[in-house]
């Protein structure tokens, strides 16, 4: 799968989103055709991680907007084709000012939604494969029917992965056993050749990312299992055994 490159059309940027790196909606030109896209100005390695992981998810069959490498007056930007629907937080009206009890109810509702998607366990395994350190409710897109996975800049060892958020949502939704079983199966089935089938432009080298994911895929099922510790796991070592 080829990473396409494009250019930013001047004076078309409109602020959108509330993420760590403020994104804009803008018009980009790719292969002579104009498209609406979400564009981010982030460090180069984060741009490349976004592009690589976005394509990798697509090769693995997960719904992810196409990533585009943007050249803009000497700067390299990240863009993804605009899916046209909001993230889960916006769709459900989440904000930090609502009472804690309401936040917990919304979080449970969000967890139920994510765990209802047929590919959520596969996405959980894929997040483990790329060491996704920034999955959150703002980077699931959902329009009430269709969904997509976005935001993969804090991956591939560029940022610590302290948790697997989809695994945590599964626990919150009471679906831990179901997602654990499906996640282990997905980890064993992920195509190990997928990273090598991503073709970057001539100026881009993805070899470090390819090697990283290849290493992550070794023992991936075990790492997925470790995201769902059992009571015996939690107590191991306490009695010296």
What kind of feature is each model-predicted range?
Residues 102-161:
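Conserved kinase catalytic-core segment
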Residues 71, 91-106, 163-173:
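Short, surface-exposed, charge-dense and proline/glycine-enriched linear segments
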Residues 78-80, 89, 93, 124-137, ...:
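A broadly tuned preference for mixed-charge, low-complexity surface segments
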Residues 33, 53, 66, 119, ...:
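Catalytic cores of nucleotide-sugar-dependent glycosyltransferases that transfer UDP/GDP/TDP-activated
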Residues 3-5, 34-41, 57, 101-112, ...:
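Residue-level signal for well-ordered alpha-helical segments
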Residues 143-241:
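C-terminal catalytic region of ATP-dependent kinase domains
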Residues 68-72, 110-114, 177-184:
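Short C-terminal domain-edge/linker segments immediately following a structured domain
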Residues 1-95, 100, 127-132:
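Conserved ATP-binding subdomain of kinase catalytic cores across diverse folds
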């Amino acid at each position: 799968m080829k990473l396409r490159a494009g250019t930013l059309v001047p004076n078309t940027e409109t602020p959108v989103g509330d993420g760590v790196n403020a994104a804009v909606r803008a018009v980009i030109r790719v292969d002579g055709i104009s498209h609406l896209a979400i564009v981010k100005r982030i460090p180069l390695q984060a741009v490349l991680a976004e592009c690589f992981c976005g394509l990798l998810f697509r090769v693995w069959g997960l719904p992810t907007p196409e990533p585009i490498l943007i050249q803009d007056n000497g700067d390299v930007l990240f863009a993804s084709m605009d899916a046209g629907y909001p993230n889960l937080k916006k769709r459900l009206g989440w904000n930090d000012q609502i009472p804690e009890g309401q936040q917990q109810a919304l979080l449970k509702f969000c967890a139920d939604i994510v765990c209802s998607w047929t590919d959520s366990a596969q996405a959980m395994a894929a997040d483990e494969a790329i060491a996704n350190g920034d999955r959150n409710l703002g980077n699931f897109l959902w329009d009430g029917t269709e969904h997509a996975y976005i935001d993969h800049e804090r991956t591939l060892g560029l940022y610590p992965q302290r948790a697997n958020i989809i695994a945590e949502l599964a626990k919150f939704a009471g679906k831990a056993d179901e997602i654990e079983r499906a996640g282990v199966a997905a980890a064993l089935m992920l195509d190990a050749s997928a990273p090598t089938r991503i073709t970057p432009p001539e100026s881009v080298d993805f070899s470090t990312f390819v090697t990283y994911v290849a290493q992550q895929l070794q023992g991936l099922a075990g790492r997925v299992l470790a995201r769902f510790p059992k009571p015996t796991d939690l107590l191991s070592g306490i009695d010296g055994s």
